[in-house]
Amino acid sequence: MTKKMRRVGKYEVGRTIGEGTFAKVKFARNTDTGDNVAIKIMAKSTILKNRMVDQIKREISIMKIVRHPNIVRLYEVLASPSKIYIVLEFVTGGELFDRIVHKGRLEESESRKYFQQLVDAVAHCHCKGVYHRDLKPENLLLDTNGNLKVSDFGLSALPQEGVELLRTTCGTPNYVAPEVLSGQGYDGSAADIWSCGVILFVILAGYLPFSETDLPGLYRKINAAEFSCPPWFSAEVKFLIHRILDPNPKTRIQIQGIKKDPWFRLNYVPIRAREEEEVNLDDIRAVFDGIEGSYVAENVERNDEGPLMMNAFEMITLSQGLNLSALFDRRQDFVKRQTRFVSRREPSEIIANIEAVANSMGFKSHTRNFKTRLEGLSSIKAGQLAVVIEIYEVAPSLFMVDVRKAAGETLEYHKFYKKLCSKLENIIWRATEGIPKSEILRTITF
């Protein structure tokens, strides 16, 4: 089978770990230090075509400004003649949303810890004049120690000098404040606080406070703050949530008030921000202003005769998500996205089965180089869902099928994945089927 080696400057780039409309995020390793990183890759042609230069500049600048232990760190920005590479901290614990899906809902003590860390991160952003505007569990990651990391500053805003109100409607509808939906000017700080309240409700309840199958109905509920807390919520957390989900931004509780709340303060240990470092924006200017000689070397070797061979350092980072628990020790409290499975069928047979099942579910499929994209309506018929499926060889005649969301609601994606797997039982391999651990370890490439 074929093996892919790709280098971008000092980074050895591996598999795709995330994909959106305008960018891919790939796992990579710094060959100088051996550290793992995530690299967000964007085509310059796409950025120019969609007039996103200012937005990308803003996202990079903001991530350089807001350095905090509970915010994903940006290391550097690189460029080739055709692409931009944003090198980020690699967060290994998956999304907070994955933990909610795995457990159904979280206990108050665990929810409180995550909420405290979220509020600390948001407060740090606000003191720097930055408003996130797209806070939701999918943008909250967990590290190996279970600490929260805020990510995805693509919709963030820095207010213009002398302008106190923001006017652009951004974010995921279920988490957006009423004043944002109104289309009038709004205070970015108050809007972020509302989103934090929705997140707190979701991690405690396991479902959204505001949910409808049509947008007008959803907007009506949000504008009226029409929700009810389940019976397992304590009186103290109910009181705090109602103060946060106040539809009037002028009377809504502020960060300082949240930090004084008795429920919030229980076992609260404030996180200190990283020591102030001089913010250097020269690499951003170099990337976007096309300074001569600023390009990083990019080297790709690939033929398309078979799936990518996954090497050892990629396998290790995936070990806790794979259903190959006999290979590696596994922490029982470690939850990572597990929307992937293993098969011993030929790649062409795997793809044919996936396409047939997807078509029966009403999804269109497009396959190239052992990578399949599926597109269709989500189960609630309220929006599009796009899924990317890629096959990797992890050992001779043993293939990992990685399934990830490219667009759409995360909860709908998990429903889709469960249904897809239930229809692919004939090709999914279980570890009990008898391949020795020693055989797999011996055949992983280094």
Curated annotation (Swiss-Prot):
Enzyme Commission number(s) from the entry: 2.7.11.1
Reaction catalyzed: L-seryl-[protein] + ATP = O-phospho-L-seryl-[protein] + ADP + H(+); L-threonyl-[protein] + ATP = O-phospho-L-threonyl-[protein] + ADP + H(+)
SMART domains on file: S_TKc
Lineage of the species this protein comes from: Eukaryota, Viridiplantae, Streptophyta, Embryophyta, Tracheophyta
Keyword Lipid biosynthesis: no
Cofactors, names only: Mn(2+)
InterPro entries: Kinase-like_dom_sf, NAF/FISL_domain, NAF_dom, Prot_kinase_dom, Protein_kinase_ATP_BS, Ser/Thr_kinase_AS
Post-translational modification: Autophosphorylated.
Effect recorded for residue 197 to E: Abolishes autophosphorylation
Active site: 134
Physiological role: Involved in the regulatory pathway for the control of intracellular Na(+) and K(+) homeostasis and salt tolerance. Activates the vacuolar H(+)/Ca(2+) antiporter CAX1 and operates in synergy with CBL4/SOS3 to activate the plasma membrane Na(+)/H(+) antiporter SOS1. CIPK serine-threonine protein kinases interact with CBL proteins. Binding of a CBL protein to the regulatory NAF domain of CIPK protein lead to the activation of the kinase in a calcium-dependent manner. Phosphorylates CBL1, CBL4 and CBL10.
Annotated domain remarks: The activation loop within the kinase domain is the target of phosphorylation/activation by upstream protein kinases. The PPI motif mediates the interaction with the ABI (abscisic acid-insensitive) phosphatases. The C-terminal part (309-446) of the protein is required for the phosphorylation of CBL, but is not involved in autophosphorylation.
Protein name per UniProt: CBL-interacting serine/threonine-protein kinase 24
Any Gene Ontology biological process: response to salt stress
Location(s) in or outside the cell: Cytoplasm; Nucleus
Entry's family note: Belongs to the protein kinase superfamily. CAMK Ser/Thr protein kinase family. SNF1 subfamily.
Effect of residue 175 to D: Increases kinase activity
Residues the record lists as binding ATP: 17-25, 40
Induction profile: Up-regulated in roots by salt stress.
